[in-house]
UniProtKB/Swiss-Prot annotation:
This enzyme's EC code(s): 2.7.11.1
Protein name stated in the entry: Testis-specific serine/threonine-protein kinase 1
Keyword NADP: no
Natural source organism: Mus musculus
Activity: how regulated: Activated by phosphorylation on Thr-174, potentially by autophosphorylation.
Length: 365
């Protein structure tokens, strides 16, 4: 039985193709029960690799079934047919994804970015409180509903965190995601704290929201890693970002995993909290550290004209809600160059100012 017939029997009228990979595709469909359009991810077990079937797909299905948050794509139904096809019926991002939105409209104003970033951060806190990590946070996985609210999608790399006998989270050894959003410890192949990895990716996303460009050029991974480990974050002067916004980004893009912000610290940061905005620069001391953890510590260097931010170039192809690449094997670095996936230009922004550099981070074991 073909997909249209299977979906028809379940009360869905199949629509257009939204995306297709080697063993999965996404179709739009109209739900006769819900009375609106949905997205249907169809996975063919016969074509999928064994590691995906044995590890990643069961994790994704388990996690999708347990999540219920206003800023996470809803999963309405999951079913499987006798011929080995899995159907995941999900909320449709009717306004596309955040990357295409920014490519079309440019960088967001801080108030709009704050709203969207708060929605995303609230979704991540919800997940982290459940010991669920996403591990593939990027603008393409942030869908927009009819009112342009953020809907976190694609839990293909997600997992439940395990704890040891003392209650500490066990480090992850699956190195996954896109290089442009990957934390330094992941790029280096070091076993990592998955929740802390998510925080780095949040920092990259916020940078893209307010700058309209990537914070790092991933065409040269070794060079990018060196810049990241030196804690260099360059902001376009033309964007006139507030110190509070730069400070939050700088703290999330902290190479030292022991100093990187926790999700609760992000949500309590003065830029995210409406009542705390407008903090005077007097709260920052000479060393660039604030008197409270949530106050700005970012200090620009006058005259700096470094090059690391990479422009986003418009793409012709629309982004689908489903990932098409296979999942990685354990202990194998599988980060993907973002420029290969989304058509980023290697041209660099020159109109930048650099964040206050820190000492190189200590080796994390």
């Amino acid at each position: 039985m073909d997909d249209a017939a299977v979906l028809k029997r379940r009360g869905y009228i199949m629509g257009i193709n939204l995306g297709e990979g080697s063993y999965a595709k996404v179709k739009s469909a109209y739900s006769e029960r819900l009375k609106f359009n949905v997205a249907v991810k169809i996975i063919d077990r016969k074509k999928a690799p064994s590691d995906f079937l044995e590890k990643f797909l069961p994790r994704e299905i388990e996690i999708l079934a347990m999540l219920n948050h206003r800023s996470i794509v809803k999963t309405y139904e999951i079913f499987e047919t006798s011929d080995g096809k899995v159907y995941i019926v999900m909320e449709l991002g009717v306004q596309g994804d955040l990357l295409e939105f920014i490519k079309t409209r440019g960088a967001l104003q801080e108030d709009d970015a704050r709203k969207k970033f708060h929605q995303l951060s609230s979704a991540i806190k919800y997940c982290h409180d459940l010991d669920v990590v996403h591990r593939d946070l990027k603008c393409e996985n942030l869908l927009l509903d009819k009112d342009f609210n953020i809907k976190l999608s694609d839990f293909g790399f997600s997992k439940r965190c395990l704890r040891d006998d003392s209650g500490r989270l066990i480090l992850s050894k699956t190195f996954c995601g896109s290089a442009a959003y990957a934390a330094p410890e992941v790029l280096q192949g070091i076993p990592y704290q998955p929740k802390v990895y998510d925080i780095w990716s949040l920092g990259v996303i916020l940078y893209i929201m307010v700058c309209g460009s990537m914070p790092y050029d991933d065409s040269n991974i070794k060079k990018m890693l060196r810049i990241q480990k030196e804690h260099r974050v360059n902001f376009p002067r033309s964007k006139h970002l507030t110190g509070e916004c730069k400070d939050l980004i700088y703290r999330m893009l902290q190479p030292d995993v022991n100093r990187r912000l926790h999700i609760d610290e992000i949500l309590n940061h003065c830029w995210v909290q409406p009542k705390a905005r407008g903090l005077s620069s007097g709260a920052i001391n000479k060393e660039g550290e604030s008197s409270r953890a949530t106050e700005p510590s970012w200090i620009p260097e006058p005259g700096a004209d470094k090059k690391s931010a990479t422009k986003l170039e418009p793409r012709e192809e629309a982004r689908s809600e489903a990932r098409s690449e296979s999942k990685p094997q354990e202990d194998t670095l599988q980060v993907v160059r973002q420029s290969e996936n989304v058509g980023l230009s290697s041209e660099l922004n020159r109109d930048t100012e650099e964040g206050h550099p820190q000492q190189p981070s200590e080796t994390h074991t």
